[in-house]
Curated annotation (Swiss-Prot):
Coiled coil: none annotated. It comes from Crotalus morulus (Tamaulipan rock rattlesnake). One of its GO terms (molecular function) is toxin activity. Belongs to the venom metalloproteinase (M12B) family. P-II subfamily. P-IIa sub-subfamily. Disulfide bonds join C12-C16, C22-C36, C24-C31. Inhibits ADP-induced platelet aggregation in human whole blood in a concentration-dependent manner (IC(50)=89.5 nM). It is found in: Secreted. GO terms for cellular component: extracellular region. The keyword Disulfide bond applies. This is Disintegrin morulustatin. Its main location: secreted. Keywords: Cell adhesion impairing toxin, Disulfide bond, Hemostasis impairing toxin, Platelet aggregation inhibiting toxin, Secreted, Toxin. The disintegrin belongs to the medium disintegrin subfamily. The lineage of its organism: Eukaryota, Metazoa, Chordata, Craniata, Vertebrata.
């Protein structure tokens, strides 16, 4: 399971673009994941 996979609605990536910290329920913050860049 890649970081951010639990945020299927895309909210995590949206928060990341807004400059907010986002924890998708795993130790890895999805804002640091390649999938959100």
């Amino acid at each position: 399971l890649r970081p951010g996979a639990q945020c299927a609605d895309g909210l995590c990536c949206d928060q990341c673009r807004a400059g907010e910290e986002c924890d998708c329920g795993s130790p890895a913050n999805c804002c640091d994941a390649a999938t959100c860049k």
